[in-house]
Amino acid sequence: GANCGGCGFAGCRAFADAAVKAPNLDNNYCPVGGNEVMKKVAAILGYEIKEKAPMVAVVRCNGTCENRPRTNIYGGSSSCKVKASLYAGDTACPYGCLGCGDCVNACQFGALSMDETTGLPVVDETKCTACGACVKACPKSIIELRNKGPRGMRVYVSCVNKDKGVVARKACSAACIGCGKCAKVCASEAITVENNVAYIDFTKCRLCKKCVAECPTGAIHDVNFPVLKPKAAPVEEKKEENNG
C-alpha cells in the first residue's frame, strides 16, 4: 500500500483494521484505490458502498512572477513552512504561494512539480490520487481537493486573498477583488463572496462559465473545457444583375 494517510488513518494497515471493525464503510474510503478498490473491499466484507466522485488537488493561487511582483528577497531555508513562520512572503500578497515546493516534496505519487516560469506548483491530474498530502503540507492553505468534474472540466477561483479589492489588486494583478459580479450572474447560486474573496461550491456549479467571462481580473479559471471553433462568417450571396 501507499501508506499516504489520505484515508485519515496512519497507514493502510490501520485503515484495514478500522474497515474490518466498522459496521459499514460509510466513513472509510481509500482515495488512492478509488471506487474500484473500495468495491473489492466491500465485497470481501459483505458491505455495500456508495461511489464517490473523483477528486483532484487544485492550486488556488495565480500569483505568477508576472502577476505578483517580488518586493523583497528571501535567503533563508527553502521550506514553505519555515518561510511562513518567519514572515508573510517575498511579495505584497501575504496569502499566496511561497514557492518553496513543500507540496511537491509531500506528494508520494509525483503529481506535483514547480513551474520555473510562473514559480507556482502544477498538478498532473493523471497522477494525482487526491490523498491530500499536499493540502496538509501547504502553510498558506492554497491547495484544495475539488471534484474532478465531468471529463475533468471544472471552474474555480484561483485566489484566496482576503484583503480589500484595492489592496489585493495592487499586490497581484490576477487577484479576486471581491466585487461580486460572478455571484450575480450565477443562476445556480454556487458562488459566495466572504471576506473579500469569492468561492465556488463545486457541488452546485453547473459549469456554465458565465462567471469566468464576468470576472474583471481573470481570477476565475476554467479547466479542460473543449476549445470551440469560431463560427464562420456568413457568406453573402451575390445578386445576379438583371440586364433586362
Segments predicted by a language model, with ranges:
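Strongly charged, low-complexity linkers/loops
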Residues: 181, 191-193, 197-199
